[in-house]
Amino acid sequence: ETYNIGGGAELPNMTVIDTICAEVDRAFAEVDGLAARYPDAPAAKGEPTISLKTFVTDRAGHDRRYAIDETKARAELGYAPQRGFEEGLRHTLRWYLDHESWWRPLV
């Protein structure tokens, strides 16, 4: 069987980007040493991360959002997300910040 696992949060792509930027800024304000680890980041210089966002011409067939239908997983497995979108994003971002040795060799 195949199941889609989603968070029940259907958001426009731009909202996702804005939320990521806000969470990065929040992390820089709350986590000691981030500015030293990432000195080129806008937040390390006191600038908002959203300043990195630029607008480009949409490609043909551009998706304004991506939605996952987890209805089958809910019905057959009793699945339900444990976190809302913003909390889950914050948790994911903090995991990556805490596990740089895992992802750094991949970039």
Region roles according to the model:
Residues 1-107:
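C-terminal substrate-binding subdomain of Rossmann-fold SDR/epimerase-dehydratase oxidoreductases
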